[in-house]
Amino acid sequence: MSQSEPHIVDVLIAERAPRLTGSWVWPIVRPILYAVLGYPKAVAMAGAIEPLSGVDALAYMSNLLRLQVKTEGFENLPTSGRCVIVCNHPTGIADGVAMYDAIRRVRDDAIFFANADALRVAPRLAETIIPVEWVHAKRTREKTRNTLSAAKQAFADERCVMLFPAGRLARVEQGVLVDEPWESSAVSLARKHNSPIVPVYMTGPSSRLFHLFDRFSRELRDVTLFHELLNKQGKRFSLTFGKPVLPEKLSIDADQASLQLKTYIERQLAAQPNVPFSP
């Protein structure tokens, strides 16, 4: 990156807050907001992982955060062969690091569906993630084709495929943390590739600044992504793995099947870990 080009962290912030960063007030509030968001730490992290391989980038993030990850029902995760892990999304990017920390205890072949912007920070993350354009307006046939092609290869290689079907951090509704509506892609892929689905319920530290800003501004909320990753250092995460669900046990309708899984994970698996999925 040349001296004249903006840093990727600035670019991602500008894309998430175009009205704010394009307004006359931005030069005034930027120093304050950047201090609150821990901007220097985000720049340092991005610089550290930019040249790394996909495996090394994930390992770097794991070592940087040093999360305390507790698992329950971990025996329900197949130690080999294709499978699809679906999980709620309570805190943000750190959820993926917590899942990585858990899975790597028994498998070294996991691949994660993740926001395609990750490749703009560290290009070789393409070795360990399947990039997805989560902004519907930015999706193209080529991007979708590339995502599906990468997924097809992962299943052909009998890998463990991990998705957060909500695609974004959960929101607080009436005092309760609830995922956004789930995309149906996890169910569709599992069905197409005859893969068992492993449901996981995750809890972690509250992303307070995200939820505070969410009350006032979507743009302010969305620029907290790096802050809500780096402030999870040393925090506790709990992952409850449910028994694998065969795709044929789900509703034929992919959207309905996704809702069934979401409801099971948020309401039943969270409270009764030993109770298997039942449509």
Positions of predicted regions on the chain:
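Generic beta-strand structural signal
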Residues: C83, D108-I111, T128, A151, ...
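Membrane-interfacial amphipathic helices and adjacent loop/beta segments
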Residues: M45-F74, D109-N146
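Non-catalytic C-terminal accessory region of glycerolipid acyltransferases
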Residues: I8-I13, T144-P279
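Membrane-anchoring hydrophobic helices of lipid-metabolizing enzymes
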Residues: M1-V86, G96-A98, R105-R107, V275-P279
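Short, contiguous strand/loop micro-motifs
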Residues: A44-A46, V86, A137-K138, V172-Q174
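Short secondary-structure boundary/hinge segments and terminal tails
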Residues: T79-S80, V121, V172, R208
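Catalytic core of membrane glycerolipid acyltransferases/transacylases, capturing the structured
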Residues: I28, V36-P40, V84-T140
